[in-house]
From Swiss-Prot:
Keywords: Oxidoreductase
Cellular component GO terms held in the UniProt record: cytoplasm
Protein name from the UniProt record: Peptide methionine sulfoxide reductase MsrB
Domain MsrB: 14-137
EC numbers: 1.8.4.12
Molecular functions per Gene Ontology: peptide-methionine (R)-S-oxide reductase activity
GO BP, one annotated term: response to oxidative stress
Domain of life: Bacteria
UniProt organism field: Deinococcus radiodurans (strain ATCC 13939 / DSM 20539 / JCM 16871 / CCUG 27074 / LMG 4051 / NBRC 15346 / NCIMB 9279 / VKM B-1422 / R1)
Family: Belongs to the MsrB Met sulfoxide reductase family.
Enzyme class: oxidoreductase
Catalytic reaction list: L-methionyl-[protein] + [thioredoxin]-disulfide + H2O = L-methionyl-(R)-S-oxide-[protein] + [thioredoxin]-dithiol
Length: 157
């Protein structure tokens, strides 16, 4: 995926999304659903690479910023630099939370909370695995995400 491809993204029709996504992916990304804690594919995933929006493929988070928050969902301290996420105030459970959505596809991703590691900015992006697709470091170039290899340069792996 190139930057041009990302900016030219046109969201598929609802019928196309229903066909392409699993039921939980559709529920989470299109209807602000939440997968059950400790059930998603990536909550304890530990491989180097990036996480992209399951709908659009737009890059969202790096494994370098992923940490175990003990909450049962993938947690990150920040998005990939220069990635645009949309934030909205969500009152669905009776109090204000900050919802996080992808910019191009407007996919519901999860929420951001101010209880992350202080030494890494203090934020916890609590993201549903169902909203993500993982691209391993070894496949970044082949899948069109080669520009993100630089995030990992100089890292002993």
């Amino acid at each position: 995926m190139t930057q041009d491809t990302k900016t030219d993204f046109q969201k598929p029709s609802d019928n196309d999304l229903r066909e392409r996504l699993t039921p939980i992916q559709y529920q989470v990304t299109q209807h602000e659903g939440t997968e059950r804690a400790f059930t998603g594919e990536y909550w304890d995933h530990d491989e180097d690479g990036i996480y992209v929006d399951v709908v659009s493929g737009e890059p969202l988070f790096s494994s370098l910023d992923k940490y175990d928050a003990g909450c049962g969902w993938p947690s990150f301290t920040q998005p990939i630099p220069d990635v645009a996420l949309t934030e909205n105030t969500d009152y669905k459970i009776g109090y204000a939370r900050t919802e996080v959505r992808s910019a191009s596809a407007d996919s519901h991703l999860g929420h951001v909370f101010p209880d992350g590691p202080r030494d890494r900015g203090g934020l916890r992006y609590c993201i549903n695995s169902a909203a993500l697709r993982f691209v391993p470091l070894s496949e970044l170039d082949a899948q069109g995400y080669g520009q993100y290899r630089a995030l990992f340069e100089g890292r002993q792996g």
